[in-house]
Structure formats: C-alpha cells, structure tokens
Amino acid sequence: MRLLSLLTVLALSVPADLFDLASARLGPGLPEGWKVRAVRGQRAPDLEVRNDGEGQVLRIHGAGRAAWFYRELSPRLEESSGRLRWSWRVLETPADADMRSERLDDSPIRLYVVFGKPGIFGNAARIIFYTFGDSEPAGFERASLVSDKLYVIRVAGVDDRARWREHSVDPFADYRRIWQRTPPSITAVGVMQDTDQTRGQATAEIRRLEWIVP
C-alpha cells in the first residue's frame, strides 16, 4: 500500500516522501522499502528511528564502518524540473576527514542519486553524492577517486555541525553539468555513512527526504 501511495504522488507531481519516517517503527533498523549493503569488508553503521521531540528522524552512527542505504524507485524518475529536498544534521564528524584525500575521504552522511541501470553496485550506473564534508572550501566538488562514474559534491561542512540544515538540489541539472550528456532516469536514492578510512566516530540524523516537482 505504501508503494502504491509513492507511485501515486510521483505520478501526480506532488512532494513524494521517500522515507515515510512518520509511520516507521521506532527502534533499530531502516524504514520500510529501504535496503542496506555494507561496503566490502566493512560493517554497516548502526541505524535507529528515533523521536527527537519534533518528529521522527533516522540516526546513523558508526566508527570504522561503511555502508550504502538505498531505495530503488519504481517507476523511475524521468528528467523533469523536479528537485530533491532533505533535512539533516551532523552531531559528530570523523576526525581529520578530508574529501580531497583518498586516505581521509570519510563522511558522517552523504545523500546520493543513482542514474541509469538499477543495479547500483555494478559498473553501469552513474552516481552523484551530495556530501557533508569537513573543512574543504565551500562548493568543493570532484570526480570520485575510485571511478569517474561517481561524482562528489560538498553541500555542507564542519561549520554546519549540530544544526539542522535544509538542502535542495536539481540532480538532472547536475548530471548534465558534470558529464555533459543527457541524463538517464533516476533509479535509486540513498544515504551513506563511511568512516572506514579514518576509523573515526560519526553520528548524523536525517529527518526528511522528498522529491518535489513545482
């Protein structure tokens, strides 16, 4: 029934709640419809749906861990004027993390968008990561050090810790700008926490994740 509701709001071009945290069960685990896959050789961070007094949030906490948390979309999101909007806060960042260094490239939370082939762990899809960084310059971005099919954009950093931050991005426009080609459909969205490089502690919360069409 919840999947049917998601399909309906996507079709009607009204905000689509991709988390549905309000109806999620409090306690450890992910909201319904979401999956987890640990980065190879790593344990997944701990997840918990909590109520912070203003509503339900998903808390992600780990140290020396890394995993993908994702929701595959059906139907896929075709190119449009839509935007992805979310609200998050970071309570603890891994010490010495730096997006500019391969050996220090950790983040307390990244929100990512998968374009193309839905098998997001294969080699066909392209992924944009909207990342909570550290002390890198505002607006810092680059191709991933792992693959040119992955692209990382810093949208917040160390000065934004402990505060709820609202973000809104246009993934299709970013895709065109980055890869200079027509974007395929969006097949999945997800969040990620990785502290496997620095082995530091990280704690982050996300309250809302929506697809909005004006």
Regions found by a protein language model. Name each.
Residues 21, 189, 207-211:
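Extracellular beta-strand elements of beta-rich domains used
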Residues 72-84, 158-161, 182:
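Extracellular/lumenal carbohydrate-interaction signature centered on repeated Trp-anchored short motifs
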